[in-house]
Structures are given as structure tokens and as C-alpha cells.
């Protein structure tokens, strides 16, 4: 009688769904008010002129205009601003 011993069980085999974080609108792109610019965990990028910060640290445009990324301040922080068109 052909027989195969049962394989053992494993404790692996699961992974979390990706959260699609990152920059959604890059420097120089034009955006409308309310457009999401960056999705992030924590403030990797800080809000500058005409940019709002959501409760999950999402950065969004408050006005229509062009996206501008810059590094400034004593701690070399990244900021994103909207230059009104």
C-alpha cells in the first residue's frame, strides 16, 4: 500500500498588506486643493507653506499650485510647500 507520512505544520505563511506609503506628487507637479502629496508614518517630511498635516501624518495641499520640496533648518528637515499658481 503506497503511503506518505503527513508533513509537519508550520508557523509561517502570513504577511501584512502593503500600505502604499510614499510621495504621491513630486516636485514641480501641479496639484489642486485637497490633493495628497505624501503618505507617511510619522513626519519624515514636514508641512510647509499651504500644506496641511492629517491625523495619520498625511501631507495634503491646501491651495492649488506647484509642489516644492526643500531641506532647511538646523536639523536639515525635509519640508514640502505649495507655490500658488
Curated annotation (Swiss-Prot):
Keywords, sorted A to Z: Ribonucleoprotein, Ribosomal protein
GO molecular function: structural constituent of ribosome
Superkingdom of source: Bacteria
GO cellular component assignments: cytosolic large ribosomal subunit
Transmembrane stretches, start-end: none
Annotated spans, Disordered: 1-26
GO biological process: translation
NCBIfam families in alphabetical order: L27 (TIGR00062)
Family label: Belongs to the bacterial ribosomal protein bL27 family.
Protein name, as recorded: Large ribosomal subunit protein bL27
Biological source species: Saccharophagus degradans (strain 2-40 / ATCC 43961 / DSM 17024)
